[in-house]
């Protein structure tokens, strides 16, 4: 009897260990940034949303309705079990009329508003950064009062040197985390010569959103926010280091992930990227 108990116990432990090993690196849904399908959606929204849903995707980042009335677009989202988690906002509009971003987010039931670009001349300066801090802290306060979180998506020009760090450090240190945080695009951290894992570790809990995008190995980077979209490759096949990033992102508290594939091959590549992410296991 005792021996049988020990045998059963060992089997249970073995199954438990195997179960733990099989747990994916991440448990959150993997969504997609609709910009990935910017060429396929216009005039073809019902078909594309159905195709996206059949990929196993449930979460979207977007904000536009691609020529359809918002109500009709929302009906198609519901039909395909899709929800918009975050919407985009123009920096200048956010500065002048933050309520418009609140209204857009509420239209789609989104919990996040993301700004993707800070207007500047050839070089992003400390004055540009200071202005952005003022705009984001002010607008972010209004958004928070309406149950919406504001994030900024860097594009590489923010990593120019400033003081003992970078202008991104200035943004991170001066944005009130209660009002404004970040969406990390791992491509646009790697492209200007930074380490996405190190940045996640440096600023844990400041990146609730993440764009997953890989870069063709050997691509030359820059700090201008410029890149050939055809250098976007299937996740795991480039030089960004997606596997390590996913582990670090989980520890850093990333809440929502969106594949963004800007290449002309996005319809073919996104399912392959999803398959790669599903293959990742804890060590």
At which residue positions do the language-model features occur?
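N-terminal pre-domain/capping segments
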Residues: 26-112, 280-283
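Bacterial Sec-dependent N-terminal signal peptides
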Residues: 1-29
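Active-site acidic/histidine proton-transfer and metal-coordination neighborhood
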Residues: 50, 58-59, 91-181, 267
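Acidic/histidine-rich catalytic cores of soluble enzymes
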Residues: 145-239
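C-terminal helical cap(s) of enzyme catalytic domains, especially alpha/beta-barrels
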Residues: 266-283
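Acidic-and-aromatic substrate-binding clefts and catalytic sites of carbohydrate-active enzymes
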Residues: 38-43, 59-71, 89-97, 120-124, ...
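Conserved, mostly hydrophobic/aromatic
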Residues: 32, 52, 60, 77, ...
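Hydrophobic faces of well-ordered beta-strands that scaffold small-molecule active sites
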Residues: 30-33, 60-62, 84-89, 113-115, ...
């Amino acid at each position: 009897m005792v021996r049988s108990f020990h045998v059963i116990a060992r089997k249970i432990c073995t199954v438990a260990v195997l179960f733990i090993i099989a747990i994916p690196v991440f448990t959150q849904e993997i969504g997609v940034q609709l910009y990935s399908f910017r060429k396929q959606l216009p005039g073809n929204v019902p078909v594309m949303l159905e195709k996206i849903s059949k990929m196993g995707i449930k979460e979207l980042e977007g904000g536009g309705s691609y020529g359809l009335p918002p109500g009709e677009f929302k009906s198609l989202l519901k039909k395909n079990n899709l929800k918009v988690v975050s919407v985009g906002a123009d920096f200048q509009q956010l500065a002048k009329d933050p309520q418009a971003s609140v209204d857009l987010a509420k239209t789609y039931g989104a919990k996040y508003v993301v700004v993707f670009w800070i207007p500047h001349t050839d070089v992003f300066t400390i004055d540009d950064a200071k202005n952005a801090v003022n705009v984001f802290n002010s607008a972010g306060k209004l958004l928070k009062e309406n149950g919406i979180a504001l994030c900024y998506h860097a594009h590489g020009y923010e990593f120019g040197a400033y003081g003992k760090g970078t202008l991104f450090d200035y943004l991170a240190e001066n944005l009130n985390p209660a009002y404004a945080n970040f969406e990390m695009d791992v491509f646009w951290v790697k492209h200007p010569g930074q380490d996405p894992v190190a940045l996640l570790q440096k600023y844990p809990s400041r990146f609730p959103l993440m764009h997953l995008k890989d870069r063709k190995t050997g691509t030359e980077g820059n700090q201008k926010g410029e890149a050939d979209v055809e250098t976007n490759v299937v996740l795991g096949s480039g030089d960004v280091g997606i596997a390590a990033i996913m582990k670090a992102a989980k520890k850093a508290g990333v809440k929502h992930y969106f594949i963004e594939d800007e290449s002309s091959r996005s319809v073919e590549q996104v399912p392959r990227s999803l398959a790669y992410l599903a293959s990742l296991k804890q060590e």
